[in-house]
Amino acid sequence: VIAALSAWHEQHDAASTALRTVRALPAHVLIEAYSMLTRLPSGLAVAPALAAEVLAGRFGERTLGLPDDERDRLISALADAGVLGGASYDGLVALEARAHGATLLTLDERARSTYRRLGADCSVIA
């Protein structure tokens, strides 16, 4: 998301093209994007209101969250799949996408194995 929104990012063109038709994000991805946009280094950070406006304008207001029953089993699902540490956040993203039948687009090759272990469809942006 940050790469798609940031012309200075080395993967901007590929990410922007790949995310062109995306209109909803897993809730955790949306929060991470907002967090990053408002804390980027070297004067690149934007005001909170602008970050919210950009994200809503680009990806809409729809977020993909976990249904109640899956939220109640979140930690068990991560443990059963052998997901641990920081990869737990990737696991949350995977479960949110899977619950809505969405395919994850990523530049993060490392996260791909977590997404797959939890049954989420994913594609690496090239």
Question: What residue ranges belong to the model's regions?
Answer:
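Active-site-proximal, substrate-binding regions of enzyme catalytic domains
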Residues: 9, 34-81
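Aromatic- and histidine-enriched alpha-helix N-cap/loop-to-helix transition segments
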Residues: 25-28, 92
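A generic structural signal for short hydrophobic patches within well-formed alpha-helices
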Residues: 1, 30, 111-112
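Short, structured coil segments at secondary-structure junctions
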Residues: 59, 100, 118-120
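Short, well-structured N-terminal submotif of metal-dependent ribonuclease cores
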Residues: 1-26, 40-53
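Histidine- and aromatic-rich ligand-binding microenvironments
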Residues: 25-26, 85-87, 108, 123-126
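Short loop/helix-cap segments at secondary-structure boundaries that form the rim of catalytic
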Residues: 112-118
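Active-site neighborhoods of divalent-metal-dependent phosphate/nucleic-acid chemistry enzymes
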Residues: 61-110
